[in-house]
A protein has these predicted regions:
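N-terminal export/targeting and maturation segments
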Residues: 20-107
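N-terminal hydrophobic targeting signals that begin at the initiator methionine
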Residues: 1-2
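Hydrophobic membrane-insertion alpha-helices, especially the h-region
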Residues: 5-28
Length: 178
């Protein structure tokens, strides 16, 4: 009888531990998926230093997890370095924004290329003939506005999460964008 009680106690302990591990792993998975798939929504609402653009960064970094609707004129590429191309406007010259060399790259309608670092600060710019452009002649705010306009159709369709983990997202990313 005593052996049966020990066996039952061991079974209860093992099942309890298994249940706790399963619940913990499930909560971790749900939380991780939530933070990634809603990262643009959270980034749009996170306090951040002016000029850092966390929503644009999250859009590119988590492109495989966020909602990327089929929109005529928008092309997504995530088979290496993520980038988004927008050929919606009537100029005939597409714009693109993507990951590049530890930072981000933007190519405008005039084939001017801009390289931003991981904190979204402009590092260099090249004209269509690949000649360096003096950064003091560039309106960085205007360029960031163009990038935002390029990505606007995707930014606008990011929905509110069912479980709002804004506080956790802020804990994880706020130092990066301040």
């Amino acid at each position: 009888m005593k052996a049966l009680k020990v066996v039952i106690a061991v079974i209860i302990v093992v099942v309890s531990i298994g249940l706790v591990v399963f619940i913990g792993a499930s909560m971790y998975a749900v939380t991780t998926i939530n933070l990634l798939s809603n990262s643009v929504y959270y980034a749009q609402r996170m306090p951040h230093k002016e000029g850092t653009e966390p929503d644009l960064v999250m859009l590119i970094e988590n492109m495989g997890e966020i909602y990327t609707p089929k929109i005529e004129g928008i092309r997504y590429d995530d088979d290496g370095a993520n980038f988004i191309e927008n050929s919606i406007d009537s100029s005939g010259h597409p714009t693109s924004f993507g990951e590049f060399d530890g930072g981000y790259h933007y190519s405008d309608k005039n084939d001017v290329s801009y390289k931003f670092d991981k904190n979204f600060e402009l590092e260099w710019a090249l004209d269509k003939d690949y000649k360096k452009i003096d950064l003091t002649t560039i309106d960085e705010t205007k360029i960031k506005g163009e990038i935002r306009e390029t990505l606007k159709p995707i930014l606008d369709v990011q929905s509110k999460p069912l479980i709002n983990l804004q506080w956790l997202f802020n804990m994880k990313y706020q130092d990066r964008f301040n």
